[in-house]
């Protein structure tokens, strides 16, 4: 440069610096006209070395910036592109200067350079975008204002030229190959043709890594800057930014958690636009695919309608039809002019035709629409060949579902909902991860989140339900899904628990082995569900249990009932509140006989006598009162399976009153009387008296209507009378005593007991005594399959063992022993029926203040449960 120009550029006054820049511009223009490019190189080198790179000299850097801008203006649009690689680096370096004035002039200089370079500036877009991203958060208002002007200019250039501008940097006169070529032998001149470099100045694939790095910026101004740029790139035709959606989608979700409302607003708008674009492209590709399938169908129909029978041999006719079909199919990917070229197609080998048909079918069946070389003159629609990477998008969405921000969760759910309707199959590999988060959202406090989560969960359930047939085997990894469901079940609320059971039921129908492999977790899930108070959850759990405990899977039922009894033994509160209901529901869903058989055999192995007595009383009470047990009661009454009665009798021997109740249900009154006589030989405990009191109340229930009518036939049922009178003689005089006594006194007994017995004996000797009802009602136990003596001996053995155990306990604990009151281990209110009836027995009043009366729908339950001492006050009250 001339010294005057150099001095003017370094002047403190802006007017003098501006005048010097104009002189420099004239000088460079003169060099361009004269072709003195060497001097231009020296001027640029001087401006960079001595001025723009002069660190800690703000005035020198300002001079260099003005000089470089003037040089770029002088070079013009035709020549500036070749010098940008030397001009731009020092200008961009000044954006990081500590002096705000230098940063301001850097913005001004780059603005002037970009205004001249236009599309050529796009070659250095990454570097420019990087400095703009940093300067957008500048603390100085003047610098930020200049940066906004520069940013606006770069956006305009990108919007206009990014999708089609090809740089001329490598297409100048320097280094080009000759346009003509002369043949050295003949002397002929030929024109050379070279392939044009079609590489665009702007490269989106090169820009995406930088965007991925910057998208996680924290500064709100930078975030707004990034969102604005993404809008520009998204709306620029031909760039196809949506193809790189997974690269920046995760960063946009972090913007939604920004504390500044303007950041959240612009981000929300951008994400709506992105989702709309995804939806548009997917629908477009689906529409194009359907059109192609329709074209194929039309061609096939045209072939079928045009073919007529000929006199050719069958093999030749089939081959001809096949070649004709190949001709029609070939038209899908060839120009129209080639469709009529029968000669070329007729010479095609049949093996090649088959291979072409196979590839064509694979193309039509593919999920994404692939790009074809020629589309028979069809108009190209932007977006029809874009490949949307849904798996990576879903990964980002699932990660953001676990966010603590409600807005982020809502948008992630909305995206998942839309993509599920577009391409549901891509969610199959992500089911386990999605459900682990989605089930938590079902219990969210925000109703909007819960509502959308329910919809998404329903869509996923429908998706898995639609996977049927061998072709889908192995596509869904049910094992991880089951693990995820069982883990989420215990920490979830009711809605989430119900959803978990819905999934487990579905998986069992699809892949039973996957459920059966997770026995421990399944048992815990079912037990937790049955212990809950929600009716829908219990219904789902029972439905799953019914599926798991199929008729052929007794081992599963046994293991489940073992775990259930273990839970009851460990959780006394659960026994008090839910044991009756749980056992009743399980028996109603499964076969009652099957459940009673299995659970009775399990109780035989328990050493805890008190717990065993509790469970036997629950089973006995349910057998008498539950409507679901009517079939089992009828089976016991008709003695269809004597061995079943025998097994129940032996298992229930630890609880004598329950054994007597069983005999009453089976109408085996002789056996009941014998048991009563046998047990009277041992010391009667308070527990037994309480249960007898309850049994007397149960005699008034509808279940024993038949027994009460049988009291009118004393000659046929003498042991019924003896048993009832025996119970009357055993219990203390109380309200229960008065109730039973009134019932017995209401009978019109006009004969003595001896006459009744003699009449009974004479009737047994009569060969015509074979009435069907009397056979059922009055069976001789000694002649039946119930093995009378064996059962009585077993009962005696159990009673003696229990008597010995009681004596040992009294010796160990002495006078302070507190015996557990059977019948008082449940709460006073049956939570499933919510019915309370006033007590009828002062004996029970001596123990508990209130007691429910039985009905056919609920068990008899004593209130204020707990282990109570049999003290003197109770004894005195019983005596009274």
From Swiss-Prot:
A single cellular component GO annotation: fungal-type vacuole membrane
Modification sites for Phosphoserine: 767, 805, 867
UniProt feature, compositional bias: Polar residues: 359-372
Main localization (coarse): membrane
Disulfide bridge partners, by residue number: none
Key word rRNA-binding present: no
Entry membrane topology: Peripheral membrane protein
One example of a Gene Ontology biological process annotation: protein transport
Gene3D superfamilies: Leucine-rich Repeat Variant
Residues in coiled coil: none
Secreted in keyword set: no
Outcome following mutation: residue 56 to Y: Loss of interaction with ATG18 and VAC7
Entry's Gene Ontology molecular function annotations: identical protein binding; protein-macromolecule adaptor activity
Intervals holding HEAT repeats: 82-119, 243-280, 388-425, 429-466, 517-554
Annotated function: The PI(3,5)P2 regulatory complex regulates both the synthesis and turnover of phosphatidylinositol 3,5-bisphosphate (PtdIns(3,5)P2). Regulates the synthesis of PtdIns(3,5)P2 by positive activation of FAB1 and by controlling FIG4 localization. Required for FIG4-mediated turnover of PtdIns(3,5)P2 after hyperosmotic shock. Essential for the control of trafficking of some proteins to the vacuole lumen via the multivesicular body (MVB), and for maintenance of vacuole size and acidity.
Note: Present with 12388 molecules/cell in log phase SD medium.
Domain notes: The N-terminal domain mediates interaction with FAB1 and VAC7 while the C-terminal domain mediates interaction with FIG4.
Protein name: Vacuole morphology and inheritance protein 14
Organism of this sequence: Saccharomyces cerevisiae (strain ATCC 204508 / S288c)
Organism placement in taxonomy: Eukaryota, Fungi, Dikarya, Ascomycota, Saccharomycotina
